[in-house]
């Protein structure tokens, strides 16, 4: 696939993968993107997952024929983008490997110290002339690994963005970009908002008309939309007005409380209510909803003098991703010593700019008139 005269796509689709990074459900598979920049000299941009080495090398051969690549640029050492380096260098031993010092250290760890015959160690801001095209290397540490580099090609106004602007799904999946890009971002990159903000500031100084990520489609239209979403996500802003309700329930009584709240919110005109049963839903989708909307309600029974395990895991997932700038409401249930609300509130004590609603709902075993009234009051408070 030719993206621009001189820039070609040589990546692969993975239709068989079920769990990405060993935890994220990917029903529509994954794309591992790789590119060739062909000028007077030729540069390969990253490799692909180890299961697709033969297909990837065949893509290179089909495009270049007997010509040998001059460079392979390693922007990111995570194995879904670097695992084929040894096979590549067995085929093209004279090709120079271009990467920063941290990436070469990781390369030694993954492959041993004798992998590369020719190394070109780059620093932040270095350039590499291919002919008419010049590659500019921009370090993007912790987006989302420490060695990450992105690459800008001035002639084509193209940014090779590593894992930035990536998404779940193969390239032939027909779906809205934002949904799976959001789930990917908050699952994998979400902790590193400050680092993404730093990269966006660097990118703002560039004239970009095309973004080539390592996962998902090449972006070449309406870039302001994608960059705007990344700015919102990485600054922990509110993307959409609405309420995410995340709940766990043992015998259905806490679920009934969550459902009543959802009904009341809708009756009051809440623009969106996203319900997540944490025992049954994809946890990454629940995390996605919690970051998408400005308000979150957590509903949990007390269990072993603590929060129900699925809820505890969910709160941990939010906090480790720097959950902030949100309003949280709490619903607890307990038959003799309800303490879940206190525990859930305490879990966010180190989080920034979290506001708890004045109304906290306590259900004593099952809903009654008092707890229903409290739920209705919570709905009104959330809709102010």
Protein language model regions, located:
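Short, charged N-terminal beta->alpha structural module
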Residues: 246-268
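FMN-binding flavodoxin-like domain, especially the glycine-rich phosphate-binding loop
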Residues: 171-211, 215-218, 260-276, 286-384
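Metallo-beta-lactamase
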Residues: 2-5, 99-148, 192-198
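Conserved beta-strand hairpin/beta-sheet module of binuclear metal-dependent hydrolase folds
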Residues: 2-64, 150-153, 157-161, 254
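Short acidic active-site motifs
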Residues: 84, 282-286
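Active-site metal-binding motif and surrounding structural segment of the metallo-beta-lactamase
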Residues: 40, 51-98
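Short N-terminal or domain-adjacent regulatory/targeting segments
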Residues: 212-239
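Active-site neighborhood of phospho(di)ester-bond hydrolases with catalytic His/Asp-centered motifs
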Residues: 45-47, 69-77, 97-100, 159-163, ...
């Amino acid at each position: 696939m030719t993206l621009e005269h001189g820039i070609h796509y040589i990546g692969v689709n993975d239709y068989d993968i079920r769990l990405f990074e060993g935890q994220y459900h990917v029903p529509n598979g994954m794309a591992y993107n790789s590119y060739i920049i062909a000028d007077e000299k030729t540069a390969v941009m990253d490799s692909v997952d180890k299961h697709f080495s033969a297909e990837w090398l065949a893509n290179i051969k089909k495009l270049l024929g007997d010509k040998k690549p001059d460079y392979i640029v390693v922007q990111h050492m995570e194995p879904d983008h670097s695992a084929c380096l040894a096979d590549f260098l067995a085929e093209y031993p004279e090709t120079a490997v271009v990467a920063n010092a941290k990436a070469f250290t990781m390369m030694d760890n993954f492959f041993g110290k004798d992998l590369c015959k020719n190394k070109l160690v780059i620093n932040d801001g270095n350039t590499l002339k291919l002919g008419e095209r010049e590659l500019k290397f921009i370090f993007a540490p912790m987006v989302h690994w420490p060695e990450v580099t992105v690459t800008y090609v001035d002639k084509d106004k193209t940014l090779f963005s590593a894992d930035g602007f990536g998404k779940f799904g193969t390239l032939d999946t027909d779906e809205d970009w934002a949904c799976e890009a959001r789930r990917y971002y908050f699952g994998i990159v979400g902790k590193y908002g400050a680092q993404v903000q730093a990269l966006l500031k660097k990118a703002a100084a560039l004239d970009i008309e095309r973004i080539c990520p390592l996962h998902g489609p090449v972006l070449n239209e309406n870039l302001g939309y994608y960059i705007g979403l990344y700015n919102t996500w990485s600054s922990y802003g509110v993307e959409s007005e609405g309420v995410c309700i995340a709940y766990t329930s043992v015998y259905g009584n806490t679920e009934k409380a969550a459902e009543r709240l959802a009904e009341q919110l809708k009756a009051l005109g809440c623009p969106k209510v996203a319900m997540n049963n944490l025992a049954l839903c994809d946890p990454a989708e629940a995390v996605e909803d919690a970051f998408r909307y400005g308000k979150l309600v957590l509903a949990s029974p007390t269990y072993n003098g603590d929060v129900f395990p699925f809820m505890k895991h969910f709160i941990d997932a939010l906090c480790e991703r720097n959950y902030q700038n949100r309003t949280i409401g709490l619903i607890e249930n307990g038959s003799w010593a309800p303490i879940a609300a206190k525990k859930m509130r305490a879990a966010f004590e180190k989080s920034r700019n979290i506001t708890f609603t004045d109304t906290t709902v306590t259900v004593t075993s099952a809903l009654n008139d008092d707890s229903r009234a409290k739920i209705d009051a919570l709905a009104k408070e959330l809709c102010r």
